[in-house]
Amino acid sequence: MKFVLLFGVLLVTLFSYSSAEMLDDFDQADEDELLSLIEKEEARKDCIPKHHECTSNKHGCCKGHLFKYKCQCTTVVTQSGEETERCFCGTPPHCKAAELVVGFGKKIFG
C-alpha cells in the first residue's frame, strides 16, 4: 500500500512538472508570435502608401490587395530646365492585369 501511494505521488509530481513545461513552451510560442505580429504592424505603419513619393526610399512601398506596390520612377524637367528623377509607389502593369483577372474570376464564380 505504501508503495502504491509513493508511486502515485511520484506520478502526480512528474505529470504536474511536464504539464508546467508544456505550458511554458506554449506561453513562449505565444509571446514569439505576438512579437512577430507587432513587428509586422510596425513595418506596415512605416511603409509608403500608393501614389505617394518614394524617391528617397525605393523599397518602402506598402502592400496592395494582392501584390506589393513598386516604386516607379520618371524623369521630370523642372521650371529651371533641370532634369530630376521623381518616384511614386504604384501597381505595375502585370500586377494590374492579374488583379483584373482575379476580380473577374470572383464575379463569375462568386
From Swiss-Prot:
It comes from the Eukaryota. One of its GO terms (molecular function) is toxin activity. Residues 21-44 form a propeptide. It is found in: Secreted. Keywords: Disulfide bond, Knottin, Secreted, Signal, Toxin. Its main location: secreted. The keyword Lyase does not apply. GO terms for cellular component: extracellular region. Residues 1-20 form the signal peptide. Belongs to the neurotoxin 19 (CSTX) family. 03 subfamily. The presence of a 'disulfide through disulfide knot' structurally defines this protein as a knottin. This is U1-lycotoxin-Ls1bb. It comes from Lycosa singoriensis (Wolf spider).
